[in-house]
A protein has these predicted regions:
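Domain-scale activation on soluble regions of proteins
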Residues: 2-9, 65-69
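Double-stranded beta-helix
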Residues: 3, 8, 16, 21, ...
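Conserved short histidine dyad/triad with adjacent acidic residue
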Residues: 17-36, 67-71
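Short, conserved beta-strand element in jelly-roll/cupin
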Residues: 35-50
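Short, surface-exposed beta-strand-loop junctions and turns on beta-sheet-rich folds
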Residues: 50, 57-60, 82-83, 91
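Short acidic-glycine-tyrosine-enriched beta hairpin
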Residues: 53-73
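Ligand-binding loop in jelly-roll beta-barrel domains
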Residues: 69-93
Length: 93
């Protein structure tokens, strides 16, 4: 049985952006549905075949900038490549 990793990525901060790297061998069970506490801009930094999915929506390729809205359940779906994204939390409005 796989023990879920609550942080299945490496994270650094650069120029006010959160940089997250998900390994090509990440376990799919670690990529759980969740809702963020803040609205965020997510920008992929590498060519990849990963997907992004919001609740009650079909998955979309994670190949362009996304707006992830606070409180909306979502997940990423593992591809075969490494995934590197930069994330900016937006101020509450």
């Amino acid at each position: 049985m796989h023990e879920i990793n609550p942080r299945p990525f490496d994270e650094t901060i650069e120029n006010g952006w959160i940089i997250r790297k998900f390994a090509a061998d990440s376990h799919p069970l670690d990529l759980v549905w969740h809702a963020d506490d803040a609205t965020r801009i997510v920008v992929p930094l590498n060519a990849n075949d990963w997907m992004y999915q919001e609740d009650n929506s079909l998955p979309v390729r994670l190949d362009k900038e996304l707006l992830v809205v606070k409180g909306i359940y979502h997940r990423i779906i593992k591809g075969t490549t490494e995934l590197i994204v930069k994330i900016k939390e937006l101020p509450a409005s």
